[in-house]
Amino acid sequence: MLRESFHPEPTKILPDPDSLVRKFVRPGMYLHLANTMSRPNALIYALARVFGGTKPDFTISVAGLHSSAHALALSQIVKKVITGFAGDNYPKPGPNSLYQDLLMGKPFELELWSLLTLIQRLMAGAMRLPGIITNSLIGSDLIADKLGKSAFLYNKPLSGNPFGPAPEPHLSTENKGSRNKDIVFLLPLNPEITLVHGVVADEDGNIVLCPPSGEGPWGALAAQKGVIATVEKIVPRGALPPELVVIPGGKVLGITVAKFGAHPQSLRVHGLQDLPAFEGVETYMDDYEFQKEANQSAGIPAKADRWYKEFVSLAGGHSEYLEQLGSVRLRRLTMTPPEHNLRVPEDPKTVNDSEQMIILAARAIMEKIKTHSYKTILAGIGAAHMAAWTASKLLEKDGIKISVVSELGFYGMKPFRGDVFLFSQLHTKECSMLSDVPSILGTIVPDECLGVIGAAEVDWFGNINSVIDSNGKFLVGSGGANDIVSTSNTIVVAKANRHRFVRNVKHVTSPGERVVEAVCQFGRFKRQEFSNHPFELASWIPPSSDEEMETWEAVRRYTQWLPPDEDIPTPAEPPITVSELTILRELDPERIYTEQFMVYTHLP
């Protein structure tokens, strides 16, 4: 007798995001929110509307919680979040008071990973593997609460021993692992349903995503039950070029049209407007004003309540949301603004501490590129990426081309002057490649890449903290920082004060083995990678805010590190030049990163 064959139900097309959520999502589910550069924000709002006030106790995994995703906490629908970042990422990265008690389980339980390890677990889940090996987490406090549960340390295998080495005592006594002895094995993640916002889908549920694609399709492919998705447009069967389909219809439970379904985040459309499938679908940019309002409102109960009522708990759902935003605002998001140009050279005598720090970091990057065989620069968000951009432009003047990359999939980026957001779609225009997080953090960064990142705290052995402040409050998490320092030599860019340049960090979010330089407003501290030596001040320039300050005085006033020997003069940095300052200010005309005392001022 022939076995009855299994035919999955056809993808259902529903009228709106709320209907999609009602049809497929049930209380208590584990849901994943795909961070593809176009987070499914219309579906996040729909979750809040449909389940708000019902205590559904969802477990949510998502690469980052910021801006409109604050609705998850405000709606009280989440029991636990698995993430790599929670806070604000625009206009500058920093904590949001909505999450200050996260480490105490409020407003939900937290399971904190690095960006790459979260996606690697989804990759293992998608491939139905028992687990995956990672270069990240070893030596950091991020691994401590996961050992024996979702992360496991094993001795590195030895050639000629088919059964592997015998366990060693350090595996039970060193709770962070040792890079030269151990490997980390991570268990897979398999959400029940993954929520996606795509560019276009056909009536069978085949979905097109467009790079740079963040986590890519992995969260969708890891889903046990399948995917529910909003898209900008649904086209007939057979209308999509198969080479553009990223998520196959067999994985998709239901779809609906939600124009601007990623708002306030951006969506990029392939440059294929001549294809009928893409007709009427336009790239749109991040809505920075909306993101700022969401971030500023979230941590203040009265403002948060007003914001939530105005944009989330709308009886008319997504259609009413678009009406609230207005057609003029939405149309403006589809337009490319003019690039900023400075016609008059800047006077270096007007440089401030923030600008001086960024320029010193740019010099550090240039020196490393000229003296080592680095192929790329990984720009972490913040003053770090401003330094990387400035360095790349200065290197170009010297006839040296170096590719700047960022973790969400930008390769060979040339910044659009005037837009300082690291992940703006405007920076894709001249990229040489657009890819995803596994490609950048998993393959480009380990291959002769120079990392440049920020820090809330850095100690004199290079260890970095971005998780907990001096009062026990939550900061932001690792993001991709742990993944970067785990495989590449790294420069830290941070304005020095005694609460930031410390003897011992409160949480080793990113271990300091490969952190080779710390740059601040008055100089550059250096150390050798994989050494036991602390940072030493290697070059010096008086802070612009106090040009009479002595070297030893600056180190004692702004750090908890040992000052240099007064009998051995510290090499002086050359004065800031017209070219350096003009390039930097041209990149940041609104002075978001270059205003005096404005770099990470709200971190401890």
Q: How does the language model describe each region?
A:
Residues 16-30, 360-374:
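Glycine-rich phosphate/diphosphate-binding loops that line cofactor/substrate pockets in enzymes
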Residues 8-22, 38-50, 68-80, 84-346, ...:
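Conserved phosphate- and dinucleotide-binding cores of soluble alpha/beta proteins
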Residues 369, 375-384:
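Active-site pocket-lining segments that scaffold enzyme catalytic pockets across diverse folds
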Residues 34, 210, 230, 378-381, ...:
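Generic beta-strand/beta-sheet core signal
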Residues 30-34, 82, 376-378:
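Short glycine-rich or small-residue beta-strand-to-loop segments that form or flank ligand, phosphate
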Residues 145, 378-379, 387-430:
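Anionic-ligand anchoring segments at beta-strand to alpha-helix junctions in alpha/beta enzyme folds, i.e.
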Residues 2-10, 31-33, 342-357:
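Glycine-rich phosphate-binding "P-loop"
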Residues 60, 64-68:
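Solvent-exposed adhesion/ligand-recognition segments of exported proteins
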